[in-house]
């Protein structure tokens, strides 16, 4: 059964640098929740901490109602798909997919059943007897996904899983990930620096910068209503014009700029008359 993930006031420092700085968020069951941000913003450090692969200095992690802060990784019942697929070259596709089940002492017959079911989900059952070197990059990614799904986790963690694929394959795998998410109903926590990936796949996005979450919302809301200059610049191509707030008339904010007077949305801009602001064009 899919479970929500809750992160409360997590801090992780490397020396004097706070890689994760008092971060809190909560997903809902079955949500595809993205951690989006530039390199070095702390998103992968945070994801690894959720998985139990990295310790934090303070904070709490919950999976559903279960506190998992000190729970070892193999007992959290989350599965992780890494940037590097980490497939055993000497094993077949099915053997790779069922490897984790073997570590859990699942019987051979049940392992095969669950492994083939996972391969069916990613449309790779017909290639169960192949070795990884006989597969394309996209097929190897599907095998890595199937290996995670075979564990029947409460949540799936993905660390930039499409970054090693070419542009065409990335587009194809985005569609596959959306289909798999809809079919399984799993809670997915997904890390990426790719804005298009996040905006096209996510139910909600947490935008990170310098170890902090600066904005959370649906992709459309973040794109059309960025909460800061950083969000506007990072989430899309935009021209930022410096201006001064004048007044709101007929539901539109009027901003005086070097280009002249601009009439902007939204009308509920929390600005005082004469206050400096940025306009996204």
Spans of model-derived segments:
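ABC nucleotide-binding domain "signature motif"
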Residues: 57-67, 213
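Glycine/charge-rich catalytic "coupling/switch" loops of P-loop NTPases
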Residues: 224, 254, 258-281
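Helix-to-loop junction immediately C-terminal to a conserved catalytic motif
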Residues: 51
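The feature captures the beta-strand-to-loop junction immediately N-terminal to the Walker
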Residues: 36-38
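ABC ATPase nucleotide-binding domain helices that frame the ATP-binding cleft
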Residues: 44-47, 143
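ABC ATPase nucleotide-binding domains
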Residues: 75-79, 83, 87-233
